[in-house]
């Protein structure tokens, strides 16, 4: 999946499901970087007022999630559970692992 397609796929899932998790987020912006080993990086910025998704990286994210684009696509499509992928070593998390639970809920909301 090309970078632009993947970015739009993330947006198409996260933005409609944002109302499901916004109450779990604080007013302090959380910044998650999805670093794909084979296809660039994406930033998800979320707090209890808004969510933004863009290509790029950030110098001090709340957490960075490292995985392949194939594994991210499988997670987005509901073919792979993000928590299981973490414990299988397919997803590495650098930073605040507990804050990534909101991100996992955001992506699961589509299913």
Which residues are covered by each model-predicted region?
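Feature captures hydrophobic
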Residues: 1-111
């Amino acid at each position: 999946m090309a970078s632009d397609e993947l970015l739009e796929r993330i947006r198409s899932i996260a933005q409609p499901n944002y109302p499901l998790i916004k109450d779990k987020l604080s007013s302090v912006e959380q910044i998650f970087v999805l670093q794909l080993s084979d296809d660039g990086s994406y930033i998800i910025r979320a707090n209890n007022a808004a969510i933004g998704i863009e290509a790029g990286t950030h110098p001090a994210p709340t957490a960075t999630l490292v995985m392949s684009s194939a594994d991210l696509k499988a997670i987005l499509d509901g073919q792979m559970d993000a928590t299981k992928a973490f414990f299988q070593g397919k997803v590495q998390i650098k930073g605040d692992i507990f804050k990534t639970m909101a991100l996992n809920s955001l992506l699961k909301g589509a299913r």
